[in-house]
Regions:
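Extracytoplasmic
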Residues: 29, 39-41, 69-71, 89-91, ...
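Soluble periplasmic/extracytoplasmic beta-strand elements of cell-envelope proteins
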Residues: 33-35, 43-45, 75, 93-97, ...
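Structural signature of outer-membrane beta-barrel channels/translocons
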Residues: 37, 66, 97-101, 129-131, ...
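Transmembrane beta-barrel wall of Gram-negative outer-membrane proteins
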Residues: 108-146, 150-189
Length: 201
């Protein structure tokens, strides 16, 4: 079924609800569906703009790939609960805020070596904070790489970029520009049978 590869991992840390936390962290690999609803019944937004794919009706989480530090400011609405950014949906609603002034000023960098889909991940994020002229800038970059993952032939190559620029005119008015991208090239593994290989020979 289309959308099976979508998880609710972005809910981690976004709510105090115990079920959401457990489902997001413990069951994400099992493609847990909150309340049994498919991902097309959730309302994901970035800065209040609905981000569901127009053709599939689902949010493409891979476009946020590797930008954990940039997309960490989240709010969750459970079920049909109205939020500051939407009226909600039967599967819930979540908003990711990327306003540059909301990031803590400074630089944060991390490097990780893993044994999963990729074996090397590097991230760096820099935020200026809001200066006296009302400008704020946040930039982030990430790289994930593996010439071969834990399954032979499963390579992974991803580079991600994020930029948020904001001009605050007064406490009620600001203008914000956010741009991001995560071009990824990867191989996926799947279960198969010897019969398939025999048919291909």
């Amino acid at each position: 079924e289309e959308g099976n590869s979508q998880t609710i991992a972005t809910l981690t840390g976004a709510t105090d609800n115990v079920l959401y936390q457990a489902a997001s962290y413990d069951f994400r690999l099992l493609r847990f569906r909150l309340r049994g609803y498919d991902s097309e019944y959730t309302q994901p937004t970035i800065n209040g703009v609905t981000m569901n794919d127009a053709a599939r009706g689902r949010f493409n989480y891979s476009m946020l790939g590797g930008l954990n530090q940039a997309f960490k400011n989240k709010s969750i609405g459970m079920g049909l609960e109205a939020t500051a950014y939407s009226f909600g949906d039967v599967g819930g609603a979540n908003n990711i805020a990327t306003y540059a002034k909301d990031y803590a000023p400074g630089t944060r960098a991390s490097v990780a070596y893993t044994n999963g889909n990729y074996y090397l991940r590097g991230m760096i994020t820099h935020a200026t904070g809001l200066n006296k002229h009302g400008w704020a800038l946040t930039a982030s970059a990430a790289v994930r790489y593996s010439d071969q993952g834990i399954v032979p032939g499963s390579f992974y190559n991803s580079a991600s970029l994020f930029l948020s620029l904001q001009k605050v005119f007064n406490p009620q008015h600001s203008l914000s520009l956010t741009a991001f991208g995560a071009p990824t090239s990867r191989a996926a593994n799947t279960a198969t049978y010897q019969e398939i290989y025999d048919l291909l020979d």
